[in-house]
């Protein structure tokens, strides 16, 4: 598992997941503010 975590693909997927979660949080707060 330790060797697999060093793969760059893992970092790319993690970055995409964080970005998607960040966008969902921003959109959610905007909907709460403007609705």
Swiss-Prot record:
Membrane topology: Single-pass membrane protein
One GO term describing the cellular component: endoplasmic reticulum membrane
Keyword Transmembrane on entry: yes
Membrane-crossing segments per the record: 14-34
Phenotype seen when the gene is deleted: Confers resistance to fluconazole and to osmotic stress.
Record keywords: Endoplasmic reticulum, Membrane, Transmembrane, Transmembrane helix
Localization: Endoplasmic reticulum membrane
Name of the protein: Uncharacterized protein YGR016C-A
